[in-house]
Amino acid sequence: MPREIPLGFPDVRGLFSRARLLAFPSTIAFLGVFCMSNSDPEFEGIAPDGFLSGGIPVPGSLAGRARAVLRVAAYPLLLAATVVVAGAALSLEWDPARVSPLFLVGVLLYLTLLERLIPHQRDWHPSTAEWRWYGMYFLLTMVGSALAQLLVATAVGVVAPADPALPLGAEIPAALLSGSLAGYLAHRLGHTNRWLWRLHGVHHVPQKVNVANNGVNHVADIVVAQGAVQLTLALVGFSPESVLAAGLFTAAQGYFVHANIDVRIGRLNHVLASPEQHRLHHSTDLAEAGHYGSDLSLWDHLFGSFTWYAGREPAAVGLHDPTSFPATGEILASLLHPLHRAKRRRPSA
């Protein structure tokens, strides 16, 4: 039984003992961002004259320099926080039912703050009305997540999964890769299958990309997408500890890539997903709208859906045909949309 989250000081020796399982990959990822900031032509760090390389002027003021540093440090800080929380949760045996939502709230607050400090597009901030709509969709997304968990738990009760066969240090990356592949395939099917597109297309209606509208989803789309990932992990037989660690990273990445923030990760785009890639995914130009991975970009490379290159930005985001779905504010109509007879072709992959 997972014990309560302690109010006192944690067992530091136990924390480091379990957290070291994550130390090597997280350190590589953390340092990689800073290495890219010094080697990638797109951004070579902050020059002494107050300019961020890549042609972005930085005022000589402390605030301007702080924003420039934040553009480089924002993602490594998120990765570091994810590793710390995962390590603490594994070491102290925190209840995943508490850790996951609290961690998600922290990620949302952090990214929402970044959207104000270093926005990619200032006119992509949600309006008052959009905040209300996005809040309703977020609640519906939580309902979809709960339904997915219920269905997976029922299925696992019928089909007994295998027991964990790997040490935790190997199991965590294996769980991450397996869940990431399942998520990629489910997402791509959401675009290529005409029935699933009528669910997933609801997410692509907004003509802006930000943290808040990452929750704009059809309930059934969440059941399908999250159910596919959870069922894969359960049937393979990954331990709850490895699923928790991989899930924290996936959750952080999923909201990070959807954030309206001016952050670039350079060559790491070829390994990890980023806001740069996900804006292309939401492009109205279907020729550049690949990038179905929201955590790793490996699968986009492998299956030919990687379209990013440095400096590439979509001219507009949203639906290729805005009239093919109800507006975001028409929540009930969006939920009922899959029941209506299809009149237009789905977008291609």
Q: What are these model-derived regions, one by one?
A:
Residues 37-62:
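Transit-peptide-like, low-complexity N-terminal presequences
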Residues 60-77:
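N-terminal membrane topogenic signal
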Residues 75-88, 106-112:
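Hydrophobic core of alpha-helical transmembrane segments in multi-pass integral membrane proteins
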Residues 95-105, 170-179:
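Alpha-helical transmembrane segments
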Residues 113-134:
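Transmembrane alpha-helical segments that serve as helix-helix packing and pore/cofactor-lining elements
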Residues 133-316:
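Membrane-embedded catalytic scaffold of the fatty acid hydroxylase/desaturase
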